[in-house]
């Protein structure tokens, strides 16, 4: 994919311990009901507090020099700033889209600086805010062909309770396996990893921690969708992911992965550790061992899932 040069992004203000992730993220969350005793903090956002809108509105935080978390608690939205503009990975859904846009601005960036919105897959919690953020920013929206079809179909299908269909973004860019996108010195490499959806998109890029580079990876669909076909696709995708060398940072699409929970803490547990980090301490998001452990867990789980799906289909 052709390298794109765009106008600059506003300089980021340092997000010091204003978000103080202990025991909760932000004043609204502190006033909310505590998570169930047996839940971890990240897990609570997809468990007991899944429908608690105010609890979900966590404060944004900086993870690396060039990576910010700007989503609600249950589903990730990642901002990748560069000197020539910013890239947004996923958008969350209503009623959280205004919160996402406010979080981008609180992190020191103008919405107009967003040049690209990359959608990891065609589920509403990941693409639901894309149309509104595109309208506010002028960004181009990108996804794989198979999930563009899912997104466009959702725009003509009534929502739950016969509510109107969600707003869907205009198709700007159709990504393919092996494509790259370059902006302001940052290059994203794209992979097609179906299984969660037919066109789940993964992303490889470099993050910097006080100038030190680390290989980061977004696995766009971390769980099988069901059925033999989905199970076969997911297992094949996990086996391909396992062959990608040198991944140190998992940029997960949910704070807590329900199918195969991420070992040694989800996004928000790691964010708590990051808020308490002292000079010279390692960044808790740089954790190649946990990535390898999770990949093996997901491979084993995918193999078992496929066996189970085949047994169901044979009945």
Give short role names for the model-derived ranges:
Residues 67, 95-98, 105-180, 270, ...:
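Active-site HxH/HxHxD metal-binding segment of metal-dependent hydrolases
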Residues 22-33:
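Signal peptide processing junction and immediate N-terminal pro/mature segment
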Residues 53-107, 111, 202-223:
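Conserved beta-strand hairpin/beta-sheet module of binuclear metal-dependent hydrolase folds
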Residues 288-315:
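C-terminal regulatory/interaction regions
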Residues 1-6:
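N-terminal secretory signal peptides that target proteins for export/translocation
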Residues 11-24:
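Bacterial N-terminal signal peptides
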Residues 33-36, 43-47, 56-57, 62-64, 86, 93-95, 171, 180-182, ...:
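Metallo-beta-lactamase
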């Amino acid at each position: 994919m052709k390298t794109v040069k765009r106008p600059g992004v506003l300089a980021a203000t340092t997000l010091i311990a204003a978000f103080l992730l202990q025991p909760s993220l932000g004043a609204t969350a502190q006033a909310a009901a505590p998570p169930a005793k047996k839940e971890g903090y990240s897990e609570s956002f997809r468990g007991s507090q899944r429908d608690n809108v105010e609890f979900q509105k966590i404060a944004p935080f900086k993870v690396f020099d060039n990576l910010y978390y700007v989503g609600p608690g249950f589903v990730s939205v990642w901002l990748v700033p560069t000197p020539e503009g910013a890239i947004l990975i996923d958008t969350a859904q209503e009623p959280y889209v205004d919160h996402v846009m406010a979080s981008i601005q609180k992190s020191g960036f103008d919405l107009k600086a967003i040049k690209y919105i990359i959608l990891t897959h065609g589920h509403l919690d990941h693409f639901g805010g894309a149309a509104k953020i595109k309208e506010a920013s002028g960004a181009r929206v990108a996804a794989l062909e198979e999930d563009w079809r899912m997104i466009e179909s959702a725009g003509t299908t009534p929502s739950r309770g016969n509510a109107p269909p969600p707003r869907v973004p205009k198709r700007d860019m159709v990504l393919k396996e092996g494509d790259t996108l370059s902006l302001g010195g940052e290059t994203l490499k794209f992979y097609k990893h179906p299984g969660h959806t037919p066109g789940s998109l993964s992303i490889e890029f470099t993050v910097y921690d006080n100038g030190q580079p680390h290989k980061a990876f977004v696995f766009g669909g971390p769980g099988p969708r069901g059925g033999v076909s989905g199970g076969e696709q997911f297992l094949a995708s996990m086996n391909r992911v396992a062959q990608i060398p040198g991944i140190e940072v998992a940029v997960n699409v949910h704070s807590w992965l329900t199918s195969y929970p991420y070992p040694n803490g989800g996004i928000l547990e790691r964010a708590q550790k990051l808020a308490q980090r002292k000079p010279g301490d390692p960044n808790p998001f740089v954790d190649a061992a946990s990535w390898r452990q999770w990949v093996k867990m997901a491979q084993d789980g995918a193999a078992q899932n496929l066996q189970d799906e085949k047994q169901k289909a044979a009945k």
